[in-house]
Amino acid sequence: MKDLTRRKWFVWLTAYWFLFPVAGFLLLAAGVFFGYGERSYIAVHDNMDLFLAQFQMLKNTNSFLAHGVEIPFLGGISRDNLPSEMSLYTVLYMFFPTYTAYVLGILGKILLGMFSFRLLAGELFADKYVIYRPVIYMTGFVYGIVWFFPAFGFAFASIPLCVYFLIKIYRDGGKRWYLALFVYPMVSYFSYHGLFLLGYLVIAIVWLSVRDRKPVWRLMAALVVLAAGYVGCEYRLFGQMLLGGEETIRSSIVNADLSFAQILQEIGTVWKDGIFHADGVHAKVVLPVCVIYFLLLNGRYLYQRQWKKIFHDPFNFVMAFLLFNSVVYGLYDCGPLRRLVEALVPPLEGWQFNRTIFFNPFLWYGALFLVLIRLYDRGIWTMWLANGIVCAAALAVILTPNRYNDLYFTCYNRAYEHFHGTEVDELDYEQFYAPALFEEIREAIGYQGEWSAAYGLHPAVLEYNGIATLDGYLGFYSQQYKEDFRRIIAPALERVEQTRIYYDDWGARAYLYSGTDLSIVQATKTVYATDYDIYIDVDAFRELGGTYIFSRLELTNAAEAGLVQVDSFTARDGSCTVYVYRAAAK
């Protein structure tokens, strides 16, 4: 080993080996997503069925910068209910085609997470940055490649950047750091992270003021600057929340009221596994490493009777923070507490204060980083053990097929096609939206902007292709419209109690539901339905202005339901057939 340490190539490799996995992954991801293009397999849930269609509608209607206009879904939704143009992620969709913007968002999120982590770690451990550099970049890289909720990937990845700005303000107080903090919300999102960052900052201000025995004016100013930044970047959201005056579906959302035992179980589950919107894939490598280290560290403190170190060790602080966020997540399902919060702050009615859990992936990888640098401090062999651990964590993220791992599913499904000579049943991006098919449909039926609805497919497919929809998916729209739309689907809701509860107690998905099957909306080539009848009130459909229904099912009771079949259309590759129906005249 002594001979190796004298060789320049080994010294260089020890310092810069991380460049190979980082560059290799970025090239692989870019090659796969741009190589397969729109034939890639992209996550549907809360992604292609929601935000990608919203961005495409803004593009179709040239409404990114518009004010006082309605977007043609859910009977007409204010532009202010959709993502702000002051978001860097939204800007991508303003200048690039939707699929290209989505891929650039994935790659940008990785770089943002990695360099944000590098800035923060470099600030906290400046004296040993050169030594720790490989695990700084690798831990940041792993955090960056975690497959978060895509529309808010920048917001997740940039958390360390916000912490970095706040530390610089606390230590230096330079004007440039206040300016940086003011524009930081362009890569964040108030409802998911912003309000909590402000809350955590208030706690930090109180704690530091007590510890330092004087007010921390710099952070107090930072609190005002950050809040102003969020208001400026998300002025549309604040306008709707505070000045809208219209009752929204948030007022009718029914949340679970769990027992004490169920709350404890939920706390343990999210601590261990997280949630699908913020799945840090930490349970496979990061959690075991951190738990083992936690036991060894504090076992040693107890054995040596160093009680104070237990409470002053940064690693223990991070682990306690993780537990705190998990406890808050569980307490959200404590009905009396949740209703108290809503009573004290009415604008937050229906708002999920359990989103503290969204910070846990950053904390898990922060805790892992503390373990790794302490291994670095112990010598050459433990240094390479640390390198092995962080590489294992990276492989766990890359190879775990969680909900938003588009790279895994694209590679797997294309490999399956290559070796088996047939495509999988799932629809890829192009097949899901089927733009060529819907262009043919619009021309054939002479579509002129008539209000329509989808049956057996996501309304997002119609929205993406320039078809105005009475149905749709949005977590914040008029309660009155929810009730009006309910009249259309009442016959189906009366037949399936689970569907009735799903709509009445939530209602974000205003869909045409089956009167028999729990779900007939799948992103698959095969239509999985047992009942080809449709159960709707066609008079209510007409009263809301409805004309067309685009269905993946060939309806067996169209005439009885008050519908007339116009025609059927099949994609050139046979992946999808759409049956077009028109509401019969009275």
Give names to the regions the model predicted.
Residues M1-A30:
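Start-transfer (signal-anchor) and selected internal transmembrane alpha helices
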Residues P21-G113, F152-G153, D484:
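Membrane-interface coil-to-helix junctions
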Residues M114-L124, I131-R211, L219-F238:
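Membrane-embedded helix bundles of polyisoprenyl
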Residues V146-G153, F311-G366, V371-L372, Y376:
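Membrane-helix boundary/interfacial segments in multi-pass membrane proteins
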Residues G232-Y301:
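Periplasmic/ER-lumenal interhelical loops and adjacent helix-loop junctions
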Residues V285-L323:
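Hydrophobic, aromatic-rich transmembrane alpha-helices
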Residues L372-L407:
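Signature aromatic-anchored transmembrane alpha helix within multi-pass, membrane-resident enzymes
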Residues Y404-K586:
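Extracytoplasmic
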